[in-house]
Each structure stands twice: as C-alpha cells, then as structure tokens.
C-alpha cells in the first residue's frame, strides 16, 4: 500500500499558507493598511471554506450522520482531521484482515505491441485511502487556483508598489507559489488518470520534476506579467481579467448548448436540479481560474457523464499557448510604454526579454514531458518530434511556393521566342497525373 505522501503535502501547504496569511494580515492591521488586510484575509479564508465543502461533499458525510466531523469542518479543521484519519487507516491496514476485497481490472502499457489485462485486489482500507487521495487532490487544486494564485498576485503587487519585500510577505509568496505549482501538478496527474482510466498509470519521478519545472516557469511568468501591467494600468487590467474570465467560463456552456444534449442529471442522486446547476457553475469557475494562470490539462465537457473530455486535443493546447504568449507580449509592451518612476532602476528591455524567455522555457519543458516522460506516451498516435517534423516540412513547402519569380532578362525573352518558333509537334504538355500534390511536396 502506497504511503499517503500527497495527503501530507496537501495538508502541509494548506496549514502553512493559512498561517502565513493570518500572520501577515495582522501585520497589515498594525500598520494601518486595512485594504491589504481585508484582501489578504479574503484570499485566505474563502478557499479554506471551499476546501472544507469539497472534503465534506466527496466523503458524503451528510448521509453518514457524523456531527463531530461537521463541527470540525465548520471550525476549518477538516483537513487536519482527514489527514489524521488517513494515517490511522494506513498504519492499521496491516494488522486487520480484510473481510471484503474488490477486484479491479487494469490494462498494462503496451509492450512490443501487446497489452495485458491485470486483475488487482483492493481491500477496504486501500479503497478508503484512494478516496482520501482523490479528495485531497481536488482540494489542492481548489486551494491553488481560487486562493493561492490571487494571493500571490496581490502580495507581489503590494511589494512592487511599496518597493519593499518583508520577510512575512516573501514567505507567503513562496508558499503560495509552491501551492499553485503543486495544484497544477495534481491537475496534470488527475487529467492523465481520467483520460487513461482503463490503464495502469505509473508516473516516474522524472515526470514529476519535468511537470514541476514546466508549471513553475509558466505560472511565475504569468503572475509577474499581470502584476507589472496592473502597476501602470490599473483600470485596463479589469478589462483583461473580465475578457479572460468570460471567455473560459462561457466556453464549456456554449459547447454544451450547441451540442443539444439534455441537462446532466447523474452528477449526484441527492442533488436537485438547482444543486446540480450550482455544482456545474462551481466546476466551471474552477476551470476558469486554472486557465487564467496556466493550461488546465483537462477540458470541461458538461454533456459528458464524467464532466471531463477524455480526448487529448493538441490543437487546443497549441492555440492556448500561442494566444497566451501573444497576450503576455502585448501586456509587457504596454507596461514598457507606460512604466512609471518606480521602475527607474529596472532594466526594462532585459526584464521583458527574461519573462518571454521564461515562458518559452515553460513550453520547452512541456514538450519534453510529452516527448519523453509522459506515462502514456506509447498510446499517442504521434510524438511531439514527429509532429514538429511534419510541421517543418509543410512550412518549407509553403516558403517554396511563395518564393518570388526571378526577373526575366533579354536572354530569357529571346529563348522564349525561339521556343515559340519551334513546330507544335515538338512541344510536350504534361499529363494531368504528373503534378505533385501538397502532401508529396511536404514529404519530399
């Protein structure tokens, strides 16, 4: 049975960030910064409440009549109790004999073109641990993108405007960044396990390292770009946020309405139509919060029973990173044009170049992950390198087609006249089947 390290990491980040935020808010209060104190508490306590609801909802404690657990969740101590419960189950699992064992069937990754199906016995203790890991993974994603991401942006903005980084603020920013990266990592692992549910997925340590570097560069550069733009154009940042928010929030619903599918009723039997709508709106809000800072790795599909699209769409991935790179470049350009005196001692061109290179580095680590370290790369129809080679061939063919014709000189005119004077019988006209199509040119 696997050691519940993911549960321990989630609880540690949750407690550390909440403690650091409460301590920093008291510092703001003593300094008279009421607005910074209110925003710091908001971005700390709101995700705490959402995490409690998530853990309570996943374990279905309302139907199990557990008033003590409900009280602990109301006191914001639910994650600590759940972590204690997880380790009690883990350490007692080897002492008691399992009275009931379920059998799961998973397929191995193909080896030499063959894939075997393996049966595995799952006891009650291991099943409970799997449920706890799943609940804490979802809670980590909620904590990261509905709490840590706004918190990091706020504290970095305060540091830029005050031109000072205190110990408490730097500690909170560090913990918030780790929480966001960890949440994005859990989101990647969840996406892989959902899309390849019938396979036994094993993620190697190097894959975790690659995802960590990919998400670290992507999220850090995105937050810095937003803070720089906000510091010089405070009004226009509201427009940017609203455009991003409504674009990602309405996109799944537009696809759902265009599909003509009936309203989903099988999310939870105990939920009414209003409750189902609230849950779907919350999931869409979480999906929007993730995509505002990084690639979500999962595509919300409301008309699907799993609410998640299991198909990996490379086209959406490419479009997202192209649009995000262009948006970051435009925001940095506007910051460079309207920067104020607080950036007097900052080399603006070098900073812009570093941020753009940092975002490209994130994309590079993403490509490395999908090329070498993805646990299900054997199931891909084509690898990243093969797709890049095909794109390069087509690009070279397009450049050849657009190459301008050379100017015709006197010798060319004279040779054309000589050809016109030759008998028509000597002229050869190409047959229709002798022309190369675009695919042949691309493969040449």
Swiss-Prot record:
Q: Identify the residue ranges that face the Extracellular compartment according to the record.
A: 24-37, 90-140, 193-208, 257-277, 339-349
Q: How does the entry describe its membrane topology?
A: Multi-pass membrane protein
Q: Where is the composition biased (Low complexity)?
A: 423-432
Q: Where in the cell is it found?
A: Endoplasmic reticulum membrane
Does Phosphoprotein show up as a keyword for this record? Answer: yes
**A single GO molecular function term of this UniProt record:** protein-macromolecule adaptor activity
Pfam families, per database record: XK-related (PF09815)
What name has this protein been given in UniProt? Endoplasmic reticulum membrane adapter protein XK
| Native source species | Pan troglodytes
Q: What is the lineage of its organism?
A: Eukaryota, Metazoa, Chordata, Craniata, Vertebrata
Q: What is this protein's gene name?
A: XK
């Amino acid at each position: 049975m696997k050691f519940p390290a993911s549960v321990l990491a989630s609880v540690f980040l949750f407690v550390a960030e909440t403690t650091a935020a409460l301590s920093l808010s008291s510092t703001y209060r003593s300094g008279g910064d009421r607005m910074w104190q209110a925003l710091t508490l908001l971005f700390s306590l709101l995700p705490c409440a959402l995490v409690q609801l998530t853990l309570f909802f996943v374990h279905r404690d309302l139907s199990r009549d557990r008033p003590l657990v409900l009280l602990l969740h109301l006191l914001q101590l639910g994650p600590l109790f759940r972590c204690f419960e997880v380790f009690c189950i883990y350490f007692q699992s080897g002492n008691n004999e399992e009275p009931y064992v379920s059998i799961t069937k998973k397929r191995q990754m193909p080896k030499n073109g063959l894939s075997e199906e393996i049966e595995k016995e799952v006891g009650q203790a291991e099943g409970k641990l799997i449920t706890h890991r799943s609940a804490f993974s979802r809670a980590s994603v909620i904590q990261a993108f509905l709490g840590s991401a706004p918190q990091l942006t706020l504290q970095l903005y305060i540091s830029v405007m005050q031109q000072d980084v205190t110990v408490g603020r730097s500690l909170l920013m560090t913990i918030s960044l780790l929480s966001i990266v960890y949440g994005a990592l859990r989101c990647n692992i969840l996406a892989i396990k959902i899309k390849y549910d019938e396979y036994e997925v094993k993620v190697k340590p190097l894959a975790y390292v690659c995802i960590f570097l990919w998400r670290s560069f992507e999220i850090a550069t995105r937050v810095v770009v937003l803070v720089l733009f906000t510091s010089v154009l405070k009004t226009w940042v509201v427009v940017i946020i609203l455009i991003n928010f409504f674009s990602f929030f309405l996109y799944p619903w537009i696809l759902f309405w265009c599909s003509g599918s009936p309203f989903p009723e099988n999310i939870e039997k105990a939920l009414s139509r209003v409750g189902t709508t609230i849950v779907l709106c919350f999931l869409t809000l979480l999906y929007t919060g993730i995509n505002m800072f990084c690639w979500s790795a999962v595509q919300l599909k409301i008309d699907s029973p799993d609410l998640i699209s299991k198909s990996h769409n490379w086209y959406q991935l490419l479009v997202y990173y192209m649009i995000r790179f262009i948006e970051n470049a435009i925001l940095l350009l506007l910051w460079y044009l309207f920067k104020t005196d607080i950036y007097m001692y900052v080399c603006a061109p070098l900073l812009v170049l570093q941020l753009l290179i940092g975002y490209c580095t994130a994309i590079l680590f993403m490509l490395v992950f999908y090329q070498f370290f993805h646990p299900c790369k054997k199931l891909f129809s084509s690898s990243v390198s093969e797709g890049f080679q095909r794109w390069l061939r087509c690009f070279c063919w397009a450049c050849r087609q657009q190459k301008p014709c050379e100017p015709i000189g006197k010798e060319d005119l004279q040779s054309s006249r000589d050809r016109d004077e030759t008998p028509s019988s000597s002229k050869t006209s190409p047959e229709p089947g002798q022309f190369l199509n675009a695919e042949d040119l691309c493969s040449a």
